[in-house]
UniProtKB/Swiss-Prot annotation:
Pfam families: eIF-6. GO terms for molecular function: ribosome binding; translation initiation factor activity. It comes from Methanosarcina mazei (strain ATCC BAA-159 / DSM 3647 / Goe1 / Go1 / JCM 11833 / OCM 88) (Methanosarcina frisia). This is Translation initiation factor 6. One of its GO terms (biological process) is cytosolic ribosome assembly. NCBIfam families: eIF-6, PRK04046.2-1. The keyword Protein biosynthesis applies. Keywords: Initiation factor, Protein biosynthesis. Belongs to the eIF-6 family. CDD domains: IF6. Binds to the 50S ribosomal subunit and prevents its association with the 30S ribosomal subunit to form the 70S initiation complex. The gene is eif6. It comes from the Archaea.
Amino acid sequence: MIRTVDIYDTSIIGVFATCTEDLALVPPLTKPEVCTILEEALDVRVVETLINGSTVVGALSRGNSNGFLLPYGSSVEEMQKRTGVPAGILPDRLNAVGNIVLANDSAALVHPELSDRALEIIARTLKVEVYRGTIAGIKNVGMAGVVTNKGLLVHPKVTVSEREALEEIFGLPVNIGTTNFGTQMLGSGLLANSKNFVAGSETTGPELGRIEEALGFLE
């Protein structure tokens, strides 16, 4: 099975796409063969879309099985029509949603400066408990880690206290890793759900092995 791809001829696939248990959002004109790989590997339906007119779909949106979060100015109706799940809009100036929200179907870790109102919208849309925090001191937690319902992989410089908080929030063991030949902001190069994962094309064999282990795909 193919485990690495490019989107728009770049390996930072997590910037341009995002996925849940059932859906993958990709920008228009993503190569058909890439869409097929995502569909087959992740067992999802691929939806081509722009977010606020932008192709950086992964940086600007975050979802789980219950809904999708979008930045201010996005069309909730259009997203709900395309995906078939509810959508919510973050009102804050911090609205590169994929960069600042790390979520699975049970919990979400978010940028520590998000407002109480934003946390309420996240909780209501994704139907999860929401917590503020950092990973390796980084506030853009959505790109500093990847979480599924089976596993959690984060930036190699995560602190002991952050690791303990993450384990408590998500109820999963915390593993460290990289993508794309040493990229520590590993969310930029990885799409994953509880069924499988796809990484950026520059991700090495050892990195793939680490991802596979961390996200629970080794028997």
